[in-house]
Design a protein with these regions (language model features):
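Catalytic cores of the polymerase beta-like nucleotidyltransferase superfamily
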Residues: 1-305
């Protein structure tokens, strides 16, 4: 199956971003691809990367002529979400790990009905063996290897509202997965509940000075506070991922990404941008006009200086 109609629609939706994603060899996966095949409105694009070069190329591409200008929506230790100028669909770069192929991404997903991907390296769709049958039956089949089962539990309710069903056996499996987490610190608790799938509850579990962790205290915090989405754009996010290569990339880009949270590209960052990554320079030198586009940034209408 070639899925030429779906490929054409994807190109139309991504517009100029499509070529940048090809260069970064990204993998588009999850609900966005499911929505593409069920003719449902796409809310956002979840993008995964094979290696350091791919992620660096993608971030550099955001500043290129091909992308135009973008605005950062949020930055956590798991994901970076931005909205390209002129686009209605945010893109979320998954930055907590690298993935060699689409099936490596599926290994970390929670529902088989979302295990569909588009590989920009091959420009082909990839599917888990259970994807079509669970999607057609609107059935929640949980992957026991998923990274964040607490978030999965929250997503079960969301998918039930969409008409999906979950068996008692699957729900019990999910409860046992959560029970096996052995949550023993505020840091681990925050890691389990924040920064993915649009759920950001980390502020709730920030301890007071010297406050020791306990499940009872965590429950008290939930009872005292409404579950609110954290406003990531209020301040720079500290990247605390475990992968050292990803952490290196995100720490280098943190300041410039934060400026994007409060406005469009500022020419003060041009010098830092050139120094920070050779990937950025090599990417732009490969384009017509080299890196001359940086000179035009100073006078573009979005420049706040």
């Amino acid at each position: 199956m070639k899925f030429e109609v779906e490929k054409a629609r994807l190109k139309w939706l991504l517009d100029d971003q499509y070529e940048v994603l090809k260069k970064s060899r990204a993998i588009l996966a999850g609900g966005c691809v499911t929505s593409l095949f069920t003719n449902v409105e796409i809310n956002d694009f979840d993008l995964y990367f094979r290696d350091k070069e791919g992620l660096s190329t993608q971030i550099a591409g955001m500043f290129s002529q091909e992308y135009g200008y973008y605005q950062l929506h949020h930055l956590t230790n798991k994901a970076l979400m931005y909205i390209a100028r002129g686009s209605d669909n945010p893109c979320q770069l998954i930055v907590f790990d690298f993935f060699k192929d689409a099936h490596a991404v599926f290994d970390r997903f929670d529902f088989t009905a979302n295990m569909a991907a588009f590989d920009f390296e091959t420009e082909e769709f990839v599917f888990h063996e259970d994807f079509w049958k669970d999607l057609s039956a609107r059935r929640i089949n949980i992957n026991p290897k998923t990274d964040y089962p607490i978030i999965t539990a929250l997503r079960v309710d969301k998918y039930k509202q969409k008409g999906y069903t979950i068996s008692k056996a699957q729900y019990l499996k999910l409860m046992l997965m959560i029970n096996s987490l052995e949550i023993d610190s505020w840091e681990f608790m925050r890691d389990q509940v924040g920064g993915m799938y649009g759920y950001s509850f980390e502020e709730i579990f920030k301890p007071q000075d010297g406050e020791e962790f306990s499940i009872e205290k965590a429950i008290e915090k939930i009872e005292k506070l409404s579950l609110i989405r954290e406003r990531w754009y209020d301040k720079p996010a500290e990247f605390a991922g475990n992968n050292p290569e990803i952490k290196e990339i995100m720490e280098k880009w943190k300041d410039i990404l934060h400026e994007k949270q409060i406005g469009w590209y500022n020419s003060k960052n041009v010098e830092r941008f050139n120094q920070w990554t050779q990937i950025a320079s090599s990417y732009n030198e490969a384009d017509e006009g080299g890196i001359d586009w940086l000179d035009s940034v100073v006078t573009n209408p979005f420049d706040k200086e």
